[in-house]
Every structure is written in C-alpha cells, then in structure tokens.
Amino acid sequence: MNLKTKYKTKIVPLLQKEFGFSSVMQVPKIEKIVINMGVGDATKDAKLLELAQAELQAISGQKPVITKAHSSNASFKIRQGQAIGCKVTLRGEKMWNFLEKLINIALPRVRDFRGLSNRAFDARGNYTLGIKEQIIFPEIIYDNVKKIRGFDVTLVISSDNAKYNHRLLLELGMPLIKTKEHANG
C-alpha cells in the first residue's frame, strides 16, 4: 500500500475520530513539499549551481527553479538578483512519491540517525527538516558527487495546529523522536 492510499483509507478516519473532526476536510493534509538547496559557492563558480540543479532534479523528479538574492549583502559577497540556490515545489503524486522515498529509503541511510526533532514546526504548523548529505538518496551516485551538499525539506501542512500535524506525521511513518509530551502518539 502506498503512502497516499494509506493516508486516505487509514489515517484520515483515524485522525477524524481521534480529534473529533465533523468533516474529512478538517483533517490535516500535506499540501506541498518544498525542497530548497542553497549554493553559496555559486557566486564564485556557476557550474556548481548547475550540478546542484541536476542533483535536485534527480532526487525530486522535477526541474528545479533557480533562486536569486533579494538584496545585496557585502559580507556574503552577493549582489541583488545573483543566483544563490535552487528549489523545487512538489505537489500531487510526485509529492507522495518523494515523501515515501524520504521516509522509507533516505532517512534510514543517514549515519547515526536517532530520529527527527519534534520542535521543527513553525508558527503555521509546517515541518522543516535539514538533510546534511544528498548522497542518502539512491538517485545520487557517490562517485559522481563533487561536493557533499545539504538541503532543506519543508512539509507544508493544511492545519496550523502543531499537535494535529505531529500526529499526522507520526501516522505517515515519519521517525519523530518520542518525548513524554507525545508518548501516547
């Protein structure tokens, strides 16, 4: 059973019953996943940005958009409009496929992995995690990697209640660290 089917058939009814939602539409759902890779060295060498784009495309299955600096900053030696990274926004089937790959394949390959933080929810209930090495994804061939590079993965969730969102991520199989506060979940 894939993750999307599990969400629709098992997780939605469970959360609806557990939190007393009157409608299925009240149950939190993942709207999109944004993967952002900052390439600070791109200011010196434009080829690094192309390599990062290719890696991000291999990981996500979608062509990344180049992100540019909003303002100049002399301490970072960047000018306004200069390319400094790339990002991908995944929705629909690609989003579910990426999430399944992240949970079942990539995160178990992280060295000394003890679980994801419970404190990574922002004020709007979105969950962000940092991946330190792109090589944990099977699409990246280690011998072709010029530089180990990390990126951020943000799960944008429809609800702004961190308690509901935490429970949703646990049910989806995210390896969140269990604390006393969330011990029953």
Curated annotation (Swiss-Prot):
Query: InterPro entries under this entry?
Result: Ribosomal_uL5, Ribosomal_uL5_bac-type, Ribosomal_uL5_C, Ribosomal_uL5_CS, Ribosomal_uL5_dom_sf, Ribosomal_uL5_N
Q: Spell out the protein name for this chain.
A: Large ribosomal subunit protein uL5
* Entry annotated with the keyword RNA-binding: yes
GO MF annotation terms? rRNA binding; structural constituent of ribosome; tRNA binding
| Assembly | Part of the 50S ribosomal subunit; part of the 5S rRNA/L5/L18/L25 subcomplex. Contacts the 5S rRNA and the P site tRNA. Forms a bridge to the 30S subunit in the 70S ribosome.
The UniProt entry, under HAMAP family, shows: Ribosomal_uL5_B
Function, as annotated, reads:
This is one of the proteins that bind and probably mediate the attachment of the 5S RNA into the large ribosomal subunit, where it forms part of the central protuberance. In the 70S ribosome it contacts protein S13 of the 30S subunit (bridge B1b), connecting the 2 subunits; this bridge is implicated in subunit movement. Contacts the P site tRNA; the 5S rRNA and some of its associated proteins might help stabilize positioning of ribosome-bound tRNAs.
| Pfam family membership, one | Ribosomal_L5_C
Listed Gene3D superfamilies: 3.30.1440.10
UniProt lists the family membership as follows: Belongs to the universal ribosomal protein uL5 family.
Originating gene: rplE
Gene Ontology BP term (one): translation
Which key words are in the record? Ribonucleoprotein, Ribosomal protein, RNA-binding, rRNA-binding, tRNA-binding
Q: Which GO terms describe its cellular component?
A: ribonucleoprotein complex; ribosome
